[in-house]
Amino acid sequence: MGPSWLLWTVAVAVLLLTRAASMEASSFCGHLEYWNSDKRCCSRCLQRFGPPACPDHEFTENCGLNDFGDTVAHPFKKCSPGYCNPNGTELCSQCSSGAAAAPAHVESPGRTHKQCRKKPVPPKDVCPLKPEDAGASSSPGRWSLGQTTKNEVSSRPGFVSASVLPLAVLPLLLVLLLILAVVLLSLFKRKVRSRPGSSSAFGDPSTSLHYWPCPGTLEVLESRNRGKANLLQLSSWELQGLASQPLSLLLDELEVLEELIMLLDPEPGPSGSTAYGTTRHLAARYGLPATWSTFAYSLRPSRSPLRALIEMVVAREPSATLGQFGTYLAQLGRTDALQVLSKLG
């Protein structure tokens, strides 16, 4: 899983959320129609929901359905001020015009009008609302929207309450957040693994334990940190001429090699303090597993672990340089070994 996969996931998430939260009217059908996605045509709201059951109510645009079939509003709404609908037609008309006639079909410019086959209009339901108090409205017979038309249309087939939509979006958001967390965790692990020295070339995680000092060496490290400036200065100008020299040069310079062996090979005895920056730690820097270091130290005193390490590195990587060797010594804080190494310059 890479960054491109993450971008695709985010794009799909945005599209799904846009679809789930879409509140737009139909882009295919007229005001009193809705898009039938199964038959891919426009059906009349009247044929699906029947005429408005309550007086002075009319159809909302596209009967509250979007082009995905989601219910984004109630199919019926109250007439605007000054408009009435006592006969239950599709749209309200001005109250002063007397009995409201059946309204003309409302066209929507720029929309396709492929009509579905006509179906019988369901009978008019009984209005579930109660009349308002006579003093609350100047128009007798006006009906309160306090109960809303939810009860009126909830029994209709295909109706889904708009209050259910946020509940349907919530699981989708949780799944997307979980996927995003997994992707970010995978990228973080890959970044950690790609850091040099984070694990050995042989995949042995135990070698990383040798990179960190034990509690008994904190005082020694403090003294080395105080001389950090001197260490950097030494590695910058005394070893500058040795950076490109091959590591195999040490095998020919026996005097320098012997001094390095005396500095780097020794490890403390059973009662001594824990050492840091020995040949064992240097081998870990070169990516050799801890088992190799244990075997190399088991050959002492007949064979030096440092000499075995240099021979192993040169055989495995002939292009290894003294500059890399000096860098590892500097990282381990072995100023004394760097001073000996500078004798080759």
UniProtKB/Swiss-Prot annotation:
Gene: Igflr1
Protein name per UniProt: IGF-like family receptor 1
Signal peptide span: 1-20
InterPro entries per record: DEATH-like_dom_sf (IPR011029), IGFLR1 (IPR042355)
Region (Disordered): 106-149
Presence of the UniProt keyword Heme in the record: no
Compartment(s) of residence: Cell membrane
Glycosylation site residues: 87
Membrane topology: Single-pass type I membrane protein
Residue ranges that the UniProt entry lists as topological domain Extracellular: 21-163
Keyword Mitochondrion: no
Comp. bias regions, Polar residues: 136-149
Major localization listed first in the record, in broad terms: membrane
Top-level taxon of origin: Eukaryota
Membrane spanning residue stretches: 164-184
Tissues expressing this chain: Ubiquitously expressed with higher expression in lymph node. Highly expressed in T-cells and monocytes.
Function: Probable cell membrane receptor for the IGF-like family protein IGFL.
Record topology, Cytoplasmic segments: 185-345
GO cellular component: plasma membrane
Basic residues: compositionally biased ranges: 111-121
UniProtKB keywords: Cell membrane, Glycoprotein, Membrane, Receptor, Signal, Transmembrane, Transmembrane helix
SUPFAM superfamilies from the UniProt entry: DEATH domain
Lineage of source species: Eukaryota, Metazoa, Chordata, Craniata, Vertebrata
Gene3D superfamilies the UniProt entry points to: Death Domain, Fas
